[in-house]
Amino acid sequence: RSTFEITSFAQKIQPNNELEPIMRHGEHPRILQFRNTEEEIQSLADLVSSFKSSHYTSLGIICKTESQAKELAQKLQPYTDCISLLSNQSSTYIKGIIITSAHMAKGLEFDEVIIPQADDKNYHSSTDKSMLYVAVTRAMHKLTLTYSSPLRICRFL
């Protein structure tokens, strides 16, 4: 279901012999670095805006934890009102733009995925590596990872 480029990117994080790439090509995954958290949040709002003017119908903003997803949903609120938080308390799944955790995203797929805070402080353990892999493999067509200085990009990328 994911493009060849996204599948290849996922294999670098955590090799999986059962993950067979389909021969559908697309954009290479992007890793965007920002000077600070505020700049990263503004860029996430810009990425959401770009998504809304694209032909894609589903966007997953996948955080490592549910608390990070809730915090990010609040920070993005001033920029857009069309984002839904998918959490343990959610009773329904709403299509469109979803912010959720990697755990809650398991089994879902999105046309486009954004993974914020993809830094070495946030993703450093073997469990984190698995969560990152799950988040990356939710993307079917477009994948963007973001992080802020002074932190470094996560060691698994």
Language model region names:
Residues 1-4, 17, 38, 42, ...:
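Core RecA-like ATPase module of SF1/SF2 helicases and allied nucleic-acid translocases
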Residues 30-40:
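Short acidic-hydrophobic, aromatic-tinged amphipathic segments that line or gate anion-handling sites
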Residues 1-32, 156-157:
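Conserved RecA-like helicase ATPase core segment
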